[in-house]
Curated annotation (Swiss-Prot):
It is found in: Cell inner membrane. It is a multi-pass membrane protein. Its main location: membrane. GO terms for cellular component: plasma membrane. InterPro entries: UPF0060 (IPR003844). It comes from the Bacteria. Belongs to the UPF0060 family. The keyword Cell inner membrane applies. This is UPF0060 membrane protein Csal_2746. The keyword Zinc does not apply. Pfam families: UPF0060. Keywords: Cell inner membrane, Cell membrane, Membrane, Transmembrane, Transmembrane helix.
Amino acid sequence: MLTTTLLFIATAMAEIIGCYLPWLWLRQQGSPWLLVPAAASLTLFVWLLSLHPAASGRVYAAYGGVYVVCALVWLWGVDGEALRPTDWIGAALALTGMGVIASGWR
């Protein structure tokens, strides 16, 4: 389960970075060259997602819980926003759902 969770975290970070860089380009007038590492990051995201040990729909559902937590860490660490109590509660619920789904993998 630890290996799967670490793989989910790497997958989420690749997705977040791959989406954040075009956001910088579009919203913050960043360089169009940001699209090159964004494409590489999203390619890595897709490849990492293919490494997960269960049917794709189940993987996507469980991955969503880890993605929520990683996005909140990004919100705090990169965007500089303080997490609210509702963020913490939502993260706990998302991880609980991820754990329930992943516990049924064979």
